[in-house]
């Protein structure tokens, strides 16, 4: 499972302490240094043996993703869930085969309700910030598969 939290670097130890109280612990002794370098905590839920990659979001696009998240009630817990548009943009940016398969599935299920302009604006920002030119083309190629 992947999740993103908005947390400052100096708050990581407090976050780890709070998660440990719920049986969520680092997957390796290097998890803290990996978090510092790559802004992702590699964790493990002990009881279920489920791996959890916790992305340490910060100012910028991740803040915007969180602001646009939709609240879902999951068994009485109110959980913010990234919008389909932002998930598509993030998965196209990641670009792994599994991510692109996920995009195909999201497009198939949500095509009529998606704000494609938002996805395109987000991908354009990624391209400009990262000096890339392939992300909008990927969206075009993936979306052309669905009428």
Model-predicted regions and their roles:
Residues 1-147:
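Compositionally biased terminal segments of proteins
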